[in-house]
Amino acid sequence: MKNLFLFACFLLLAACSKAESPASLDNASKQAVAQSNASVIADLYAKKRSQVWVEDNGIVVKVLADDVNGARHQRFLVKVGTNQTLLFVHNIDLAARVENIKLGDHIAFSGEYIYNPKGGIIHWTHHNPQGKHKAGWIKLNGKIYE
């Protein structure tokens, strides 16, 4: 219960504080934010939690074939700061394909984390045409895919 109270206080404080734009942060601050985000994902994995919204960045370690069963999804693996590998399933029926994504690319992202034993899945990396779910995105080489 104490942890829940502290987490609620943290969220309230974060919501009330003035957010700095990424451009205004110095390198040490950017590194601390990146580590903090990766730690959140590592914690979600350790606790086997799902359906939690995350923002982070990482390096593409493998590009997979598209999933074409049902809604089409572009798939690739990304390693985040804690060396955790995430499977991205980016809906290309609702959003543009991430163009020319390749091994070694650095991406930033916002999406929903789903636990799986291999590290986790990130989905909802696109807009929601019905507006019933938070919209996500993937940023590669300065271009945002949503």
Predicted regions and their residues:
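OB-fold and OB-like single-stranded nucleic-acid-recognition modules
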Residues: 16-146
